[in-house]
Design a protein with these regions (language model features):
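Short intrinsically disordered terminal tails
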Residues: 1-4, 96-101
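Charge-rich, solvent-exposed alpha-helical interaction surfaces
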Residues: 12-15, 19, 87-94, 98
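Negatively charged, low-complexity tracts enriched in Asp/Glu with abundant Ser/Thr
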Residues: 1-42, 73-77
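N-terminal regions of proteins, emphasizing targeting and processing segments when present
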Residues: 16, 20, 47, 61-62, ...
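Intrinsically disordered, low-complexity regulatory segments enriched in Ser/Thr/Pro
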Residues: 43-86
Length: 101
């Protein structure tokens, strides 16, 4: 990952976390920032490498006790979006749509 890619993904991650933090409680569990979206849903965002391509992932858990069994939701690749705002909106949609699922 180049420095530019890292800064871009890091910036996107922080922006999404900030927007989720406006509506949800942030809680540190096992050294990771999780957001309590509702009583049955926690989310965690992370940067990963998938198929040698860097992307952001939204992880889902049903409770703090179950974060070790968290499931990866959407994988968000920067090259799939025309703008940073479009990628941020897609990630936020993943989080908010999970509430109604």
């Amino acid at each position: 990952m180049t420095i530019r890619q890292h800064l871009t993904l890091s910036g996107i991650l922080k922006s999404v976390e900030s927007r989720i933090g406006e509506r949800c409680i942030r809680k540190t569990i096992d050294g990771q920032n999780w957001f309590i979206v509702d009583e049955n849903h926690l989310v965690h965002l992370k940067c990963v490498q998938s198929d040698n391509i860097n992307c952001l992932v939204v992880r889902h858990a049903k409770s703090a006790e179950e974060i070790h069994m968290a499931e990866d939701g959407g994988h968000f690749y920067p090259e799939d979006y025309h703008t940073v705002d479009e990628m941020i909106r897609a990630m936020l949609d993943e989080v908010w749509n999970a509430i109604s699922a």
